[in-house]
Amino acid sequence: HGNTCPVMLSSSAQASLSGRFEGSVYGESKLAGEGLFREYSERTGAPVLIYRFPNLYGKWCRPRYNSAVATFCDAIANGRPYTVNDPSVELELLYIDDLVDEMLGALLGEEHRCGYDGLERVEGDDFCFVPETDMKSLGEIVYLLGCFRDSRETLSVPDLAEGSFSKKLWSTFLSYYEPGNFAYGLKPNIDDRGSFTEFLRTPERGQLSINVSRPGITKGNHWHMSKWERFLVVSGTASIKLRKVGEDTEGNPFPVDEYVVSGSDMRAVEMIPGYTHS
């Protein structure tokens, strides 16, 4: 009927029939589908967008079906058994949000085009692709997921750099916790002065802790050579005092710098290196 509306085919990397996909019946069926779409394009003049998607992953993907990442996420998050036959096997991984971004671009005629030489992407326009993919081994994936699971004990925060594989896998992993398992306990250190509880730790940006002080209690009275801290009172009122270590040119102690802060008027106070603080 003269309809030349563009059509998109969700094919698979297995259609290359290369490497470990050689002889894949599933790949052969996808390759046959690509051929039918090309014939349709030649017959009608309708543009065809053929995407050979690699391994997709993202929140709520069905485990124990056709996604290794989903299977590992579900098993490791919920204490189920799993098997890694060969940790060295590498997968090209495509995050679902990146796929959606590409599909929205394709609707606007902004798809990314390429050719293929086996599994290798080359210059060309016979196919479409999503630029944001990651090559990771099964061993790397399982190791990261184990770190994510253990983070409730270690309090560590993974690499959450924008666009990083770690951030995408972390968001995916969290979605596999079952309802009722979203909360976990912390370990407060309690004494007569109050309590100190670590909440988060990062390898490059320090940690976040909750410090509860009883009325009239003084904590601190020490200083650091290079360590830096930032205090924020969220409940009650506190007097935070700092004094530069050493003496001035006349041999007198440096003056005390005092900040009275409260939970009703939140202000962050820097614990400057080289200053005693309490």
Named regions from a protein language model:
Residues 1-31, 41-44, 49-51:
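Conserved Rossmann-fold NAD(P)-dependent oxidoreductase catalytic core, especially the SDR/UDP-sugar
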Residues 16-19, 59, 248-250:
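Short, solvent-exposed loop/turn segments at secondary-structure junctions
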Residues 35-91, 96-109:
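NAD(P)-dependent short-chain dehydrogenase/reductase
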Residues 93, 222, 228-233, 268-269:
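His/acidic/aromatic-lined binding-pocket segments of jelly-roll/cupin-type domains
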Residues 105-188:
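Mid/C-terminal beta-alpha module of Rossmann-like enzyme folds, strongest
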Residues 180-221, 227:
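A short glycine-rich, His/Asp/Glu-containing loop-to-beta-strand
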Residues 226-248:
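Glycine- and acidic-residue-biased ligand/ion/polar-headgroup-sensing regions
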Residues 246-278:
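Short acidic-glycine-tyrosine-enriched beta hairpin
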